Amino acid sequence: MQTLSTPVTGTDERSTPVSTSITRRKTRPVPVGDVIIGGGHPVVVQSMINEDTLDIEGSVAAIRRLHELGCEIVRVTVPSMAHAKALATIKEKLTATYQTVPLVADVHHNGMKIALEVAKHVDKVRINPGLYVFEKAKDDRTEFSQSEFENIGDKIRETLEPLVVSLRDQNKAMRIGVNHGSLAERMLFTYGDTPEGMVESALEFIRICQSLDFNNLVISMKASRVPVMLAAYRLMARRMDELGMDYPLHLGVTEAGDGEYGRIKSTAGIATLLADGIGDTLRVSLTESPEKEIPVCYSILQALGLRKTMVEYVACPSCGRTLFNLEEVLHQVRSATNHLTGLDIAVMGCIVNGPGEMADADYGYVGKQPGYISLYRGREEVKKVPETEGVEELINLIKSDGRWVDPE
């Protein structure tokens, strides 16, 4: 057995508690309607309706459904001038029949005129640098000369400037939304199909905006492969820090798919960055109805301690020591209390791990002997009750502390 020649003693470094909270990257606040992205504000939840924007009633209903579920900013697609003009009616009807909701217009292929029109009616315009000034790829091209590269850059500036000026003068916002799958041809030739190409694509547009004194910018670096997405966002954050830029980042894994894997894939990308302090707003993109995206967003934020909008349940995985049907009881406790906000409730199957593992919980439900459970308030055991009365008595305990509200 190896023996240390010098005993290890406490040092300042060792005795300093390690922080368990996330330190977020400092960003500027960007207003989108009455919602603020960045600037230390809570991470904002977004989604996008899948209705045709020409369907006025359907679009209004879809926006309202999302907003009522907690979607704070809603994006709509605008593929034509007719769609852009329809947004004026959508916004008007939404305000008249429901309330004002921050809206974002999604503009793509050669959308210069569309973007200028839609900027009158929405709070933010999303553009894709790879498609905003879109030129069909040439099959025989082998490279871009420096002059060709710069000439296209000049054309981009000329095309983008009217939109930037319009948004600046209205104090509205722009998202520079780079997609890994749609980088411009000249970026692909110069940087390859890489995170570096994605970052340089965004920086080109950012610099144009800065030169026109417009800084209400949000940046995204989306990709369908999580490792590419992570590398692109991390590089973007690092490059912005090096350049003294403090723009908020919009997180998302594009084309994540559906079901369990789609949720896991989105979480793997989004939560990893949020845990590093990167990210100010997010969208979970699922091949399902948009309404199903919202709970996933809030669950990610809850799990990381960035926003607390529901009950946090702590429950052991069950083992041979468990003194009651843990899965069934957890379901009963959740059903009775999941409308509450901001509580931590622990459901533990035995005394071995129970009190220790649930020490940070507001309330605990612990099996101590067959047929009985012990209820805790924090670390304090309050009472022992028959298992058949456990859920009811837990509710009574929460009520006695004035922390209960009746479900709507």
Curated annotation (Swiss-Prot):
Domain of life: Bacteria
Reaction catalysis annotation: (2E)-4-hydroxy-3-methylbut-2-enyl diphosphate + 2 oxidized [2Fe-2S]-[ferredoxin] + H2O = 2-C-methyl-D-erythritol 2,4-cyclic diphosphate + 2 reduced [2Fe-2S]-[ferredoxin] + H(+)
Alphabetized UniProt keyword annotations: 4Fe-4S, Iron, Iron-sulfur, Isoprene biosynthesis, Metal-binding, Oxidoreductase
Gene Ontology biological process terms in this record: isopentenyl diphosphate biosynthetic process, methylerythritol 4-phosphate pathway; terpenoid biosynthetic process
Binding sites annotated in the UniProt record for [4Fe-4S] cluster: C316, C319, C350, E357
The record's free-text note on cofactor binding: Binds 1 [4Fe-4S] cluster.
Gene Ontology molecular function terms on file: 4 iron, 4 sulfur cluster binding; 4-hydroxy-3-methylbut-2-en-1-yl diphosphate synthase activity (ferredoxin); iron ion binding
EC number: 1.17.7.1
Protein family membership: Belongs to the IspG family.
Protein name: 4-hydroxy-3-methylbut-2-en-1-yl diphosphate synthase (ferredoxin)
